[in-house]
């Protein structure tokens, strides 16, 4: 979808390590040939229902996102914990916190991936993009 300022790829209904990996690969890969790396932003919301694997899964996906070379923002306590040692990542506890940041720091001319579990409600951030 396209807002007045950015192009948005929204997948905020379901997220698991496999779907996150696929989304990041597509988004940052050669399939996205019209975008420059500096114009790509991944906004990743926590993945729900992972049990004891949750922390490790969020660490793995965050590292994959960082390695892809795109700007990374995260939402939710699991990604916030993973991002605490990553200076290049902006982490937010809630989608409301993300929206406040985006309103104060507008993005223009970006291609934005919004990917996370339903419980994070990342679609609400579209209003600030």
Predicted regions and their residues:
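ATP-dependent carboxylate-amine ligase
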Residues: 1-129
